[in-house]
């Protein structure tokens, strides 16, 4: 079944551990405009089976949140999308992660190009030990040859998209370390989008931030989905409810339920999901 043949309402594709109503081991049903399709994905840390037969379609131009208790596999799943595990030979993924018809798990895929297409922002702000300007320009220089004027425009564009330009435009030559925690995280988001990825992965982007900075990041996430497909891992269920269009609940390496965020939080199909959402578990 290809996307052209799918006429299913994404709001109805929300039950079963395998996601979208598919039984474990079966090919998942894809909503219209799926940006990433995960098919029978298993992940191992040595002999530990961390992800078990994950089937999931990430809708394009939407914010998808992964929730679940610590150790459930949500960050592991996120990091398979851009092969962050590739440096560790004891870690391996089996199955398929398909974007634009290409299996991202193929070993011959260029990792640098993959990570240009799928950007990532980590839990703690990680500015480079260089100026604010160079933090943005660094990644761009790896993939594009721009004139100084073009680079200036790109830096301003990225910082503006990250809602940071007005705060730093007069101190671009200063170190990124001089920014507040919230500003540093927005700098990292600007750095991620400067190379114009198709997908942006956010792994607990607000966990180290104060409430005001968290609010700014959440507003930014809502704006970014007009240009990117965004996937966020969060322990904060209120944040998932506020920011995301779709939510996946995971437990012990399995995808328990996936669907529209409003339905997941108001009327989940699975009792396990309801127990977690209401605080009776996890």
From Swiss-Prot:
One of its GO terms (cellular component) is plasma membrane. It catalyses: phosphate(out) + ATP + H2O = ADP + 2 phosphate(in) + H(+). This is Phosphate import ATP-binding protein PstB. Belongs to the ABC transporter superfamily. Phosphate importer (TC 3.A.1.7) family. Keywords: ATP-binding, Cell inner membrane, Cell membrane, Membrane, Nucleotide-binding, Phosphate transport, Translocase, Transport. It is found in: Cell inner membrane. Part of the ABC transporter complex PstSACB involved in phosphate import. Responsible for energy coupling to the transport system. The complex is composed of two ATP-binding proteins (PstB), two transmembrane proteins (PstC and PstA) and a solute-binding protein (PstS).
